[in-house]
From Swiss-Prot:
It comes from Mycoplasma pneumoniae (strain ATCC 29342 / M129 / Subtype 1). InterPro entries: UDP-GALP_mutase, UDP-GalPyranose_mutase_C. Involved in the conversion of UDP-GalP into UDP-GalF through a 2-keto intermediate. GO terms for cellular component: cytosol. The lineage of its organism: Bacteria, Bacillati, Mycoplasmatota, Mycoplasmoidales, Mycoplasmoidaceae. This is UDP-galactopyranose mutase.
Amino acid sequence: MTLFSFPNYVNWNKFDFIVLGAGISGIVLSHVLAQHGKSVLLLEKRNQLGGNCYDKLDETTGLLFHQYGPHIFHTDNQKVMDFIQPFFELNNYQHRVGLQLDNNLDLTLPFDFSQMRKLLDTKTASSLINFFQQHFPAEKHLTLMQLQTINFAPVQQLYQFLKIKVYGPYSVKMWGMPLEQIDPSVLGRVKISLSENSSYFPTATIQGLPKGGYTKAFTKMVDHPLIDLRLNCPANLISVNNNQLLFANQPITKPVVYCGLIDQLFGYCFGRLQYRSLHFEWKRYAVKQHQAYPVMNWPLHPTITRQVEYKQLTQEGLESNQTIVSCETPGAFREGDPRFMEPYYPLNDVSNNALFARYLKLANAIPNIHLLGRLALYQYIDMDRAIAQSLAKAEQLLQ
């Protein structure tokens, strides 16, 4: 691993592939290419690898935490499971999310029959559960959008609670716009469980976090003689001029896999794609455990969306009398803004998707560039899907 700047000390022309971005997508792709005998120059603008999955030990408490917010691995994809097996020894963590509301109820997400019994009086809860069992016997889940269409008073009572107290205010903060302006599909993806199964990832075959952390696992992936990893690389190493890909201002015909911001690649010629970002306030407490659940959602707080206690996720340092917690506040991504300087969630509304399509058309006109990852594809991508896409891209490039 080399920390000096590129390109002063490297002959990029000797590599079979150049990969820009050492997040989960770029790392997985580079590893697979190297395993098939291809040399890879892997470039990263940050001074660490792992993208937003990066984790490290806190200097004050000595506890492992995720610098860019919590990442819980989960998948039912066998190819993905086979790939991670040599690198991820998952702990036994099962994801749990608590709700901090304006009452003392101990509620968790996703909503299931047990949560309905806590929230509603006995008669209403029993009527609601019986209704679901009679009318949806084969369904495991219903979406919030489906609940909205059911003309039954207890269902509407549940729907209104979830919309007004839980998912509505959370979404307003998350996306920075009034509820009526948020794409209905956002709330439509929210599901309740029609059983006692409160699993946050009910379809996952495996879930958890890698013992020792993601950074340790990713470092192992890139520890290959055919991978040359360079950190602290300027983001503008790759540029485009008249449909010609330039690398360090020199024309290049080698295959380049680009995992960065697609609008930045083209100099923001059509304007900037919008993202939501997050600001983290870090707190340390001299206690073994600070909160009841690893993640506490705060839908009714004016600014904060959630609070995360990392030792409950990592299952490391549980006996320590110290703990580290992050409070997340969402905001609009603005380059150079110290609070919201990282692009996290693409704002996939009609106008931004149309803008992305224009940039994608430009990229498709360049034969030797390949887009990969959430920033290049302007998509929110779970970790297992990012790995699956990288495996598929590697297979395509090796043909």
